[in-house]
Amino acid sequence: PKEILEIPKLGCINVHGSLLPKYRGAAPMQWSIIDGEKVTGITTMYMAKGLDSGDMLLKAEVEITDEDTFATIHDKMAVTGANLLLDTLDQLEAGTLERIPQDHDAATYAPMITKETGHIDWSKNRQDIINLIRGLNPVPAAYTIYEEEVLKIFGAVISDVQADDAANGEIVAVVKKGFVVKCGDGCLLITEVQARGGKRMMTDAYLRGHAMKEGILLQ
């Protein structure tokens, strides 16, 4: 409530995991990776009645590399966010901060992650699927259905296997390092998985104990 936010003399400050007004909401770090962003960041801001809509104070950018996952970005952002909050408090106390209103017309949203968010749609292109896997690694994890069982997927790389006649989601090859799945624009090699009730492991280790079949359609 507005009356609560107005109690502190210097206002209520929030640390948000995006460069506002982009990615307002519950899961900005995950969605920035899922959407293929190359840069994200931290914004300190005044809390307001609307969702992440308050005036901004300071920002700091954080690079998203091709290898970053939700776990690694979370850790980078935690350090950046802590330092930015200290800078914000110091400048707030000194009276040197400017309030910067958000451009509400430019706002985008990062809704809460649900289990269904992680259900892989194999008709999408390979990079979009890789980004989904990265953005939900380690939790809740992207997943597919193999022979009526959930199979979580934590790693995938673009494969040069050609399978133009295969259906999207079809296992087109089982090789030493993993299994190859047909996607909307080519194939992916799945490199790290976790079966229901099992441990997370590299796919080559998983295949030593599980015989995956070519031609099976992942759902």
Regions found by a protein language model. Give the residues of each.
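An anion-binding loop in the catalytic cleft
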Residues: 123-219
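Active-site loop ensemble at the mouth of alpha/beta enzyme cores that anchors a bound cofactor
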Residues: 111-112, 117-128
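A generic secondary-structure signal marking the coil-to-beta-strand transition
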Residues: 11, 54-55, 109, 116-118, ...
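Donor/substrate-binding cores of folate-linked one-carbon enzymes
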Residues: 1-110, 114-116
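Short secondary-structure junctions and interdomain/linker hinges
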Residues: 80-84, 92, 96, 120, ...
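Alpha-helix N-cap/helix-start motif
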Residues: 22-26, 122, 199
